[in-house]
Design a protein with these regions (language model features):
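Exposed beta-sheet edge and beta->alpha loop/turn motif
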Residues: 97-148
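Short, low-complexity N-terminal intrinsically disordered segments enriched in polar/charged residues
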Residues: 11-57, 90-93
Length: 148
């Protein structure tokens, strides 16, 4: 009988320890390395022409207008291929619980129709990022016109 009581107390202490560890484990600070990881993931997804991988970097629940954005991305991948991407991160900041990154972003793409000329777009791309409990994800992207 006393063994059962001791086991029960050990479980309670362990649960209390887990709760206090969770309370002392704050949301991580958004660092330049986090922003580079995200924008590089977008680059890899484009260069491998993997739309699903591209969209996985975004938080569909928190991103304003995500359904329209998802459709815009689908259209972009349908119209273009053979992407080459270059970027240079120029700014990384954190405002409250959100991180932000600005990068000079350049993309070359080949139209799939075989008739239209190749496209080169250059934009100052701004990513707003939020922590989803496991990793940073893009919760907003501007401008979105480079996907047109």
């Amino acid at each position: 009988m006393s063994v059962l009581v001791l086991l029960g107390l050990g479980g309670s202490a362990q649960e209390t320890k887990k709760l206090s560890e969770a309370d002392s484990n704050p949301r991580p600070t958004f660092a330049e390395a986090d922003g580079v990881r995200l924008i590089d993931e977008l680059r890899r997804a484009l260069e491998t022409e993997n739309r699903g991988r591209f969209l996985k970097a975004f938080d569909a629940k928190r991103m304003p207008g995500y359904p329209a954005f998802r459709d815009q991305v689908a259209d972009f991948f349908a119209r273009y291929g053979e992407f080459q991407v270059r970027y240079h991160v120029t700014q990384t900041t954190m405002d409250g619980e959100l991180g932000a990154e600005v990068a000079d972003f350049e993309i070359d793409a080949t139209p799939r129709d075989g008739v239209s000329p190749n496209v080169r777009k250059r934009v100052a791309l701004r990513l707003v990022c939020g922590w989803d409990g496991k990793q940073w994800k893009v919760v907003d992207l501007s401008p979105r016109t480079w996907l047109e």
